Amino acid sequence: MSFAGLNDADVAAALAACTAADSFNHKAFFAKVGLASKSSDDVKKAFYVIDQDKSGFIEEDELKLFLQNFSASARALTDAETKAFLADGDKDGDGMIGVDEFAAMIKG
């Protein structure tokens, strides 16, 4: 797993809780995997793992594959889940989530 410091059992439980389509809630997921209690540096490391193209932003296509960063066999997010995730994180309205927006979303 590419997220050092997260408990594998917590990650597995968080993934199991959102296997059904439209059951993903990013706030609940962040809390279950333990990201919400991590340091700012750890949150930034998580951001850079999710930012697959290394653009400095998490775009909609990267959000769709969010769960697969935690487990290759996890499902893709639905369009509705992806749009809700993006809408909550994208505070400046540029259609992407920057590292500070991501940190605020996890800690919020």
UniProtKB/Swiss-Prot annotation:
<dbReference type="GO" id="GO:0030425">
    <property type="term" value="C:dendrite"/>
</dbReference>
<dbReference type="GO" id="GO:0043679">
    <property type="term" value="C:axon terminus"/>
</dbReference>
<dbReference type="GO" id="GO:0005509">
    <property type="term" value="F:calcium ion binding"/>
</dbReference>
<dbReference type="Pfam" id="PF13499">
    <property type="entry name" value="EF-hand_7"/>
</dbReference>
<keyword id="KW-0514">Muscle protein</keyword>
<feature type="binding site">
    <location>
        <position position="53"/>
    </location>
    <ligand>
        <name>Ca(2+) 1</name>
    </ligand>
</feature>
<feature type="binding site">
    <location>
        <position position="90"/>
    </location>
    <ligand>
        <name>Ca(2+) 2</name>
    </ligand>
</feature>
<comment type="similarity">
    <text>Belongs to the parvalbumin family.</text>
</comment>
<feature type="binding site">
    <location>
        <position position="55"/>
    </location>
    <ligand>
        <name>Ca(2+) 1</name>
    </ligand>
</feature>
<feature type="binding site">
    <location>
        <position position="59"/>
    </location>
    <ligand>
        <name>Ca(2+) 1</name>
    </ligand>
</feature>
<feature type="domain" description="EF-hand 1">
    <location>
        <begin position="38"/>
        <end position="73"/>
    </location>
</feature>
<dbReference type="InterPro" id="IPR011992">
    <property type="entry name" value="EF-hand-dom_pair"/>
</dbReference>
<feature type="binding site">
    <location>
        <position position="92"/>
    </location>
    <ligand>
        <name>Ca(2+) 2</name>
    </ligand>
</feature>
<feature type="binding site">
    <location>
        <position position="101"/>
    </location>
    <ligand>
        <name>Ca(2+) 2</name>
    </ligand>
</feature>
<keyword id="KW-0007">Acetylation</keyword>
<keyword id="KW-0677">Repeat</keyword>
<feature type="domain" description="EF-hand 2">
    <location>
        <begin position="77"/>
        <end position="108"/>
    </location>
</feature>
<comment type="function">
    <text>In muscle, parvalbumin is thought to be involved in relaxation after contraction. It binds two calcium ions.</text>
</comment>
<feature type="modified residue" description="N-acetylserine">
    <location>
        <position position="2"/>
    </location>
</feature>
<feature type="binding site">
    <location>
        <position position="51"/>
    </location>
    <ligand>
        <name>Ca(2+) 1</name>
    </ligand>
</feature>
<keyword id="KW-0106">Calcium</keyword>
<protein>
    <recommendedName>
        <fullName>Parvalbumin beta 2</fullName>
    </recommendedName>
</protein>
<feature type="binding site">
    <location>
        <position position="57"/>
    </location>
    <ligand>
        <name>Ca(2+) 1</name>
    </ligand>
</feature>
<dbReference type="GO" id="GO:0005737">
    <property type="term" value="C:cytoplasm"/>
</dbReference>
<dbReference type="GO" id="GO:0030424">
    <property type="term" value="C:axon"/>
</dbReference>
<dbReference type="InterPro" id="IPR002048">
    <property type="entry name" value="EF_hand_dom"/>
</dbReference>
<keyword id="KW-0020">Allergen</keyword>
<feature type="binding site">
    <location>
        <position position="96"/>
    </location>
    <ligand>
        <name>Ca(2+) 2</name>
    </ligand>
</feature>
<feature type="binding site">
    <location>
        <position position="62"/>
    </location>
    <ligand>
        <name>Ca(2+) 1</name>
    </ligand>
</feature>
<keyword id="KW-0479">Metal-binding</keyword>
<dbReference type="InterPro" id="IPR008080">
    <property type="entry name" value="Parvalbumin"/>
</dbReference>
<feature type="binding site">
    <location>
        <position position="94"/>
    </location>
    <ligand>
        <name>Ca(2+) 2</name>
    </ligand>
</feature>
<dbReference type="InterPro" id="IPR018247">
    <property type="entry name" value="EF_Hand_1_Ca_BS"/>
</dbReference>
